[in-house]
């Protein structure tokens, strides 16, 4: 009985998390439609294998050194990477520098 409750709880939490990710992707797509800057924080090699059209590539480890590039942008920034983890870290850096951004998750979600 206890295992059944635990499994049900895990399933419910999984569904809630998935809906939250879908919401973030939809919000990111809406921002792109309204003329935002797409920042891809994957490595140059990953970026060259495929990327969202017109996105800017600044790898996460170089972001702090290149923050001025994004400060010149007047548009919100949608940050993407391969799975959303590096994008979340990048958003933290951008927000500390007063740059409006959203974690767009995987760049594949924006296609």
Residue ranges of predicted features:
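Conserved beta-strand scaffold positions in the cores of enzyme catalytic domains, especially
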Residues: 38, 55-57, 101-103
């Amino acid at each position: 009985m206890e295992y059944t409750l635990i499994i049900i709880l895990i399933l419910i939490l999984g569904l809630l998390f998935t809906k939250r990710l879908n919401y973030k992707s939809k919000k990111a797509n809406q921002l792109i439609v309204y003329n935002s800057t797409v920042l891809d924080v994957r490595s140059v090699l990953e970026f060259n294998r495929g990327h969202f059209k017109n996105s800017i590539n600044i790898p996460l480890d170089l972001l702090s050194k290149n923050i001025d590039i994004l400060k010149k942008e007047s548009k919100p920034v949608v940050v993407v990477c391969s799975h959303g983890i590096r994008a979340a870290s990048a958003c933290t850096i951008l927000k500390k520098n007063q740059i409006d951004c959203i974690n767009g998750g995987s760049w594949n979600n924006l296609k």
